[in-house]
Amino acid sequence: MTIERVDLNNYSLFEDMVYWRENGIERSPAGPSISEQMKNELTNPNLYIYAALEDGRYVGWISLVYIPKVGQRWNGHGHIYVDELWVEPGFRGKGFAKTLMKKADDLKSELNATGIRLYVNVNNSAALKLYEHCGFQEEGNTYFMKK
């Protein structure tokens, strides 16, 4: 297993994995080109997407976002947020998710961030077990709200 940061050069391989996840079938070789919006997102300095490469294809990814904090309370250090973590079902339980989660720890150290945060569905027992194994603890009572 190799972990790679997703960028403009390897995005099509990443898109193949996402297409398979969403549609259950492989994408045709002549997949779509990278849109200007996607180019902008991939070059966002606060977005970090890492993918697990196995046998020439991506089988999982983690999407991390660094959100800086301002003011003396935070000393200019922000938080890393785990936006998404996914591993192909046939590769689960083999250390891929833990290795991808390690990238969050590495990024926290690299950016001198205050901490790592994530949201998890209370009914997703496999994810809860993984996050606890990675050192995460439940903190407070929070409502997840969207508009």
How would you label these PLM feature ranges?
Residues 83, 88, 92, 121:
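Residue-level recognition of the GNAT/N-acetyltransferase active site
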Residues 101, 108-119:
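Conserved GNAT acetyl-CoA-binding A-motif
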Residues 131-141:
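Conserved acetyl-CoA-binding loop of GNAT-fold acetyltransferases
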Residues 5-12, 16-77, 83:
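Acetyl-CoA-dependent GNAT
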